């Protein structure tokens, strides 16, 4: 038995194993993933938010350029990251609200600026949210770190070795529209 975090960690290790990648390449294969660790799944989700906004406007539910709030139940941070990308592309979004369950690692991160997976893992009735390592948050961290790959890698290494990392006040200020 295992949980989502354990499975995803194993998958990521396989994806990052250059020797295994070379073996597969020789055989004419490569790894792919259909879950949200694949950016190819996230990018089309941006269109969901544009479409939903257009429908709200067309149906008279909102005025032109009126800001909306987006609430997403999230564990792996993929869908709400797509909303963040839509907002950055100009979609009028006010708040990005991460709905959490008892594991609430994202709620705590947005409240404190420290991502800490060192806690009890709680099995709930929402297993897709039973996650302590929200892998898509890495993409947001990269963005708010000024697209600094070294800084991003350092924080992800801290998460791997220490189970936590903290963002700077400057980075945290860029997350003012996120609520946990």
Residue ranges and their predicted role:
Residues 1-180:
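PLP-dependent amino-acid enzyme catalytic core
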């Amino acid at each position: 038995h295992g949980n989502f975090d354990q499975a995803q960690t194993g998958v990521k290790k396989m994806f990052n194993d250059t020797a295994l990648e070379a073996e597969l390449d020789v055989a004419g294969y490569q790894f792919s993933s259909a879950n949200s660790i694949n950016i190819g799944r996230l990018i089309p989700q941006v269109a969901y938010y544009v479409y939903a906004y257009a429908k709200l406007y067309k149906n008279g539910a909102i005025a032109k350029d009126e800001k909306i709030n987006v609430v997403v139940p999230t564990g792996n941070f993929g869908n709400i990251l797509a909303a963040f990308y839509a907002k950055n592309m100009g979609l009028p979004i006010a708040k990005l609200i991460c709905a959490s369950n008892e594991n609430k690692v994202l709620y705590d991160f947005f409240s404190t600026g420290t991502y800490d997976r060192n806690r009890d893992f709680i099995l709930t009735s929402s297993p897709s949210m039973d996650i302590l390592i929200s892998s898509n948050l890495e993409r947001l961290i990269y963005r708010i770190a000024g697209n600094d790959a070294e800084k991003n890698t350092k924080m992800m290494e801290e998460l791997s070795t220490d189970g936590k990392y903290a963002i700077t006040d400057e980075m945290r200020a860029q997350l003012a529209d996120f609520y946990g």
